[in-house]
């Protein structure tokens, strides 16, 4: 059973700091002069400026705040919608927008407001607008270590709690587990829906990414897919009409597009969405393919983008493509082949070239994007040699740079045709 405590153990200094020294600050009598002195001192230190930055000490006391207040904080600290490989900062959103994007119930938010205005007054957080804009920003202004320390303090209090609202506690622990996982890097994160926005494409592309594991790298969208998708969207009309020499109209045969090793399907779905904008859905058939364990999620992404009428997610094993051929035919029939980041083992260059040779039509074009990882420099050279030996010609190359979840990466694009 997963225990988030295994991920992080704050040192004694951090835990003490995150308790806000409440044992010293909290008066025994709520009406005593000691409390008045505390609030007066806090008031003098706080600014009336709505832009005043808050810090971890402004988070509700784990010791004294009710679970509804802690739950609301955890929901507000949920990451914003991920666009490409970045997060929206959450600045200047309305209360309604924050509630909608975070799935936050208004009554829960009002409970947090009561905490900051009546139970533990804080001028920096004494309105719904301040709460909704400042609390989410703590993910960017407070260190991960301090946030993890706060989360751990919450876990210690509520993991074995009893006598409290069981439904609230279960929801709190669920949100808490997600916040801890999100704070520990991409490989520890739960499943997410990431949105991709491309120039010259009128709609964003939602893609579901399950939790990433070492043996299922296809569950993640890699940077090379974004680079190739942008190229496709920017130049689809040129790439298609110049190299395949046909247009999508009622007088032309059906055009067939194949994405190999599609993963989450970004490249194939980008092609499909741009094609739909330009020409509609007539005379086009698109296959996004991968291994069996990847295709289930791939089907979900086709559905998320409402492309099921002309895009099929299917199994295509590069070591045994006969099942795909027996089911659909199409050997040497694809006008366009799309491949992004296919080289991450010594066997892949041969498999990739075999698939291009087997499925590319005589007048077709393959668009290949590969990251220039030092670890696979030898495999890239083998790929280049095998392309020449297989009567395939690189007619265009271009270098580019981009980013993914692990930082900046350099990429190489190749446009490939038959000799």
Swiss-Prot record:
Its main location: cytoplasm. CDD domains: AdoMet_MTases (cd02440). PANTHER family: HEPATOCELLULAR CARCINOMA-ASSOCIATED ANTIGEN, PROTEIN-LYSINE N-METHYLTRANSFERASE EFM2. Signal peptide: none annotated. GO terms for cellular component: cytoplasm. This is Protein-lysine N-methyltransferase EFM2. The keyword Magnesium does not apply. It comes from the Eukaryota. Belongs to the class I-like SAM-binding methyltransferase superfamily. METTL21 family. Disruption phenotype: Increases sensitivity to antibiotics that target translation and decreases translational fidelity. It is found in: Cytoplasm. Present with 217 molecules/cell in log phase SD medium. S-adenosyl-L-methionine binds at residues 222, 261-263, 290, 318, 340. Pfam families: Methyltransf_16. GO terms for biological process: methylation; positive regulation of translational termination. S-adenosyl-L-methionine-dependent protein-lysine N-methyltransferase that mono- and dimethylates elongation factor 2 (EFT1/EFT2) at 'Lys-613' and methylates elongation factor 3A (YEF3). GO terms for molecular function: protein methyltransferase activity; protein-lysine N-methyltransferase activity; S-adenosylmethionine-dependent methyltransferase activity. Its EC number is 2.1.1.-. SUPFAM superfamilies: S-adenosyl-L-methionine-dependent methyltransferases. Keywords: Cytoplasm, Methyltransferase, S-adenosyl-L-methionine, Transferase. It comes from Saccharomyces cerevisiae (strain ATCC 204508 / S288c) (Baker's yeast).
């Amino acid at each position: 059973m997963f225990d988030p405590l295994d991920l992080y153990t704050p040192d004694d200094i951090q835990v003490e700091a995150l308790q806000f020294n409440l044992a010293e600050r909290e008066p025994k009598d709520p009406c005593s002069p000691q409390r008045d002195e505390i609030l007066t001192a806090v008031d003098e230190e706080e600014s009336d400026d709505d832009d005043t930055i808050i810090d971890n000490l402004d988070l509700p006391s784990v010791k004294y705040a009710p679970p509804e207040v802690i739950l609301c904080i955890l929901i507000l600290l949920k990451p914003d919608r991920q666009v490409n490989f970045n997060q929206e900062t959450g600045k200047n959103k309305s209360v309604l927008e924050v509630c909608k994007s975070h799935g936050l119930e208004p009554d829960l938010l009002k409970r947090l407001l009561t905490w900051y205005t009546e139970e533990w007054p804080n001028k920096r957080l004494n309105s719904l607008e301040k709460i909704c804009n400042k609390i989410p920003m703590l993910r960017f202004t407070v260190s991960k270590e301090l946030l993890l320390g706060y989360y751990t303090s919450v876990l210690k209090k509520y993991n074995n709690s009893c006598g409290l609202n069981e439904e609230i506690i279960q929801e709190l622990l669920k949100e808490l587990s997600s916040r801890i996982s999100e704070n520990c890097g991409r490989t520890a994160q739960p499943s997410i829906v990431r949105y991709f926005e491309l120039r010259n494409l009128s709609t964003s592309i939602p893609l579901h990414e399950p939790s990433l594991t070492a043996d299922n790298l296809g569950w993640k969208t890699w940077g090379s897919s974004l680079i190739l998708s942008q190229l496709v969207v920017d130049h689809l009309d040129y790439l298609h009409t110049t190299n395949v020499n046909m247009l999508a109209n009622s007088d032309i045969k059906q055009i067939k597009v194949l994405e190999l090793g599609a993963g989450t399907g970004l490249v194939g779905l980008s092609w499909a969405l741009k094609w739909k904008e330009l020409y509609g859905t007539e005379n086009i058939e698109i296959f996004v393919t991968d291994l069996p364990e990847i295709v289930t999620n791939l089907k979900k992404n086709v559905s998320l983008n409402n492309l099921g009428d002309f895009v099929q997610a299917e199994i295509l094993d590069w070591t045994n493509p006969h099942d795909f051929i027996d089911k659909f035919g199409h050997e040497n029939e694809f006008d366009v082949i799309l491949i992004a980041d296919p080289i991450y083992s010594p066997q892949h260059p041969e498999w990739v070239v075999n698939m291009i040779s087997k499925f590319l039509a005589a007048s077709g074009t393959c668009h290949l994007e590969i990251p220039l990882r030092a670890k696979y420099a030898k495999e890239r050279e083998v790929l280049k040699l095998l392309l020449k030996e297989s009567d395939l010609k690189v007619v265009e190359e271009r270098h580019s740079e981009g980013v993914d979840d692990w930082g900046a990466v350099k990429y190489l694009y190749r446009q490939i045709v038959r000799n």
